[in-house]
Amino acid sequence: MKYIAICDIETTALPEAGHFHCAAVKIAGKDHPPKLFTDLNRMLSDFRYVDKWVFHNGLGFDVPKINELVGYEAIKPEDCIDTMVVSKLVDYKKFNTHSLKEIGVHLKVHKGDYDGGWDTYTKEMGEYCVQDVVVLEALWEYFKPYIMDPSWA
């Protein structure tokens, strides 16, 4: 059985000096809420059996940031399914920014808002991260027929 993890991370706002705050992860197709982590190494250890990782802008941010923060290639780019890339390939005219928020609104799964700062972890930041994974799972389900279709690749 292939395990597909749906994941989002939150870090400080500065990409060049980013500090990990939290990650939310859930296994696709399982009926459980996302699990929240404030320890990146623990998250990677708990999900070491995962075959593929689903992120939104994962190739542009999450995967390189995770690998930079842990100091090794914990998640290979080829093991990342990036729903932002898929959205641009599948629905390039339907969305303007292809942001998680924009596609979530289209799917009627709202991302939520976070007005706090990004310097330190807060409970609200964790809730925001978990909700991002809820939205991301809806994107995964929406795009899965394309992603899993061998003739599309």
List PLM regions with ranges.
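Short, surface-exposed acidic
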Residues: 73-78, 110-119
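Residues that form generic nucleotide/phosphate-binding pockets
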Residues: 46, 69, 89, 103-107, ...
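Exposed alpha-helical structural elements
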Residues: 42, 65, 99-102, 124
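Generic alpha-helical structural element
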Residues: 55, 92-96, 125-128, 132
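Mixed-charge, glycine-rich, non-catalytic linkers/tails in nucleic-acid processing enzymes
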Residues: 77, 118-153
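Conserved RNase H-like, two-metal-ion catalytic cores of nucleic-acid enzymes
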Residues: 1-93
